């Protein structure tokens, strides 16, 4: 890949999010203070793959890249993001991670990987609040990219400018939200119920 760098402040480093050694090497080259981290690396699994087409090895690789990759990066850079002012961490996810919005099914590995990324992020925010780090899970929209295809309704500049605007609204109070590029808060799932085996079902007296 070739880049034309017009801004001398921009530096480009190679990074393999599946490799702890690569992530650590990148972290060692990174500035001592980081105020914004955008985890954008990801792969698709073939959008319309059905149940019979699931390949175990490829599914695990998709999950490793899309879910664990960003966690590796956050771990490696955490010390440089924890300082006296707010640091924003953006996890690029997808509406396809929403359990409530899984109307068409398929894309098993991609959906599962992004749902796992969302849960990793919500769990990490609990620890990061005390270190002045705010997380946001971003859905960039269905964008006209190599992955999104020509039928996608959202242009790249619109998606990017929208996500930049969302980042300006981040605080420790709204950390961990699942937000679309236009600012809409997205659903996690239809209902959240905690069931404890052998105990009473809350507010019903039922035992399960």
PLM regions and their residue ranges:
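Conserved hydrophobic beta-strands of the Rossmann-like cofactor-binding core
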Residues: 37-38, 42
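Catalytic loop of short-chain dehydrogenase/reductase
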Residues: 43, 50-62, 71, 82-129
């Amino acid at each position: 890949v070739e880049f034309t760098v017009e801004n001398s402040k921009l530096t480009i480093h190679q990074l393999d999010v599946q490799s702890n050694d690569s992530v650590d090497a990148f972290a060692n080259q990174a500035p001592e203070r980081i105020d914004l981290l955008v985890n954008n690396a990801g792969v698709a699994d073939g959008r319309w793959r059905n149940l019979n087409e699931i390949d175990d090895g490829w599914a695990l690789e998709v999950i490793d890249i899309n879910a664990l990759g960003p966690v590796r990066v956050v771990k490696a850079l955490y010390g440089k993001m924890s300082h006296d002012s707010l640091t924003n961490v953006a996890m690029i996810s997808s509406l396809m991670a929403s359990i409530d919005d899984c109307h068409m099914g398929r894309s098993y590995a991609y959906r599962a990987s992004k749902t796992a990324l969302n849960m990793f992020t919500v769990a990490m925010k609990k620890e990061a609040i005390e270190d002045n780090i705010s997380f946001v899970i971003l859905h960039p929209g269905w964008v006209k990219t190599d992955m999104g295809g020509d039928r996608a309704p959202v242009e790249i500049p619109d998606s990017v400018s929208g996500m930049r605007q969302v980042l300006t609204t981040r605080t420790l109070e709204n950390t961990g939200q699942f937000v679309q590029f236009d600012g809409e808060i997205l659903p996690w799932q239809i209902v959240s119920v905690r069931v404890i085996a052998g105990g009473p079902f809350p507010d019903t007296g039922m035992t399960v």
